[in-house]
Design a protein with these regions (language model features):
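Flexible "cap/lid" loop of the alpha/beta hydrolase fold
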Residues: 182-219
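Active-site loop/oxyanion-hole signature of alpha/beta-hydrolase fold enzymes
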Residues: 119-159, 163
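Conserved alpha/beta-hydrolase catalytic His-Asp/Glu region
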Residues: 220-281, 285-286
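Conserved HGGG/HGGXW glycine-rich cap/lid loop of the alpha/beta-hydrolase fold
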Residues: 74-129
């Protein structure tokens, strides 16, 4: 997922109901889903409130650069992580291509106010080594379990974004005793229930990865299209400058210097297996049996990266799951509305006994 720091810092507003949405969430029901599902929408233009964007001069913002990087040996790899805050643990599963430093400081400020937050580099990303084991959902879940064991965390609230949400689901299924709750952002339960991305966007992603593997320069149009797909049409219409690409940026490596092309290819294959395997039943049925408090967040404009209908399918299959859909947000919803997402997450977690 592409994180456009300029757009999220200079142009930040959230829907008013996000700050108080759970005061009445039990009363807001969408009858197309389970009757015991809490469904909250923040879509009415009349409820919008402009909020001053966070800046790095705010002493409460969490700058991960200021937090010491630690490493532990887990199996065949060294895992890099940072841990901060105080309270019940939250472990963050990054989106594809992102390292631990990609999380927005405003989001981290909110959630670390009453939780211990664990951000880490997945296998082969950033400061974590790639190892020799096959790059699979199962192996990445095993890595995470080993990390929690190494830092003496017995149970955590699991939060996953995009590809990280797939890994969060896999981890929850394989290690349910280590999971207190599950939050999925821009997600799908995969397999037979998955609604695919548009074919032209699948081709764009594959072309970009293949060009990166072969050191072929990317065009400005390709990069702009990739960014626009992540942000969604509503955000781009409001902030057209958010898709501007400097002329000297011609490769994925320049955007993601901590991402080796081979790992990008492995992550792409992991994602494709999850999304493009109709013979696999997916995870929805298994998640529904685990009885874990579940929060699902999606943007109204997440159409290309992860069609938002996939979030609806998770909620339909997981009894009691909460659905939050944020207006004018795309797949990059955690970058576009970091404080709002943090408030949602904190409030959801406060309801868990």
């Amino acid at each position: 997922m592409y994180s456009n720091s300029k757009s999220r810092k200079n142009h930040l507003f959230i829907v008013l109901v996000l700050s108080s949405l759970l005061l009445s969430s039990a009363l807001i029901i969408n009858n197309s889903h389970h009757s015991d599902t809490n469904v909250v929408y923040g879509q009415k233009n009349t409820t919008q409130q402009h909020i001053n964007p966070p800046t790095n001069t705010n002493p409460n913002l969490i700058n991960l650069q200021d937090i010491p990087l630690e490493k532990v040996r887990v199996g065949d790899i060294d895992i890099a992580y940072k841990m901060f805050g105080k309270g019940d643990p939250i472990i963050l599963f990054n989106g594809a291509s992102d390292g631990l430093d990609a999380w927005d400081p405003a989001l981290l400020m909110v959630i670390s106010s009453n939780h211990t937050v664990i951000a880490f580099d997945q296998r082969g990303i950033g400061n974590s080594t790639v190892g020799s084991q096959p790059y699979t959902h199962q192996q990445l879940a095993n890595d995470t379990s080993g990390l929690l064991d190494a830092i003496n965390i017995s149970k955590a609230n699991v939060v996953g974004l995009s590809l990280g949400s797939y890994l969060a689901q896999q981890f929850t299924i394989m290690y349910p005793d280590k999971v207190n709750s599950l939050t999925l952002v821009g997600s799908s339960c995969g397999g037979k229930d998955h609604t695919p991305k548009p074919a032209e966007f699948i081709k764009l992603q594959s072309d970009i990865v293949n060009k990166s593997l072969n050191n072929v320069p990317l065009s400005t149009d390709e990069l702009r299209e990739l960014i626009a797909a992540s942000l969604g049409s509503g955000w781009v219409n409001l902030h057209p400058e958010s898709v501007d690409v400097p002329a000297n940026i011609t490769s994925l490596q320049q955007l993601k210097p901590g991402l080796p092309p081979e790992v990008a290819d492995s992550q792409n294959k992991v994602g494709k297996y999850w999304e493009d395997n109709p013979l696999w039943s997916g995870t929805c049925d298994e998640l529904g049996k685990l009885d874990k408090p579940t929060l699902v967040i999606t943007g109204t404009d997440d159409i290309k990266y992860q069609p938002y209908i996939n979030s609806f399918k998770i909620v339909e299959k997981v009894p009691g799951a909460w659905l939050i859909q944020i207006k004018n947000a795309g797949h990059a919803v955690m970058d576009q509305y970091p404080e709002g997402v943090g408030i949602i997450l904190n409030t959801f977690l406060s309801t868990i006994k």
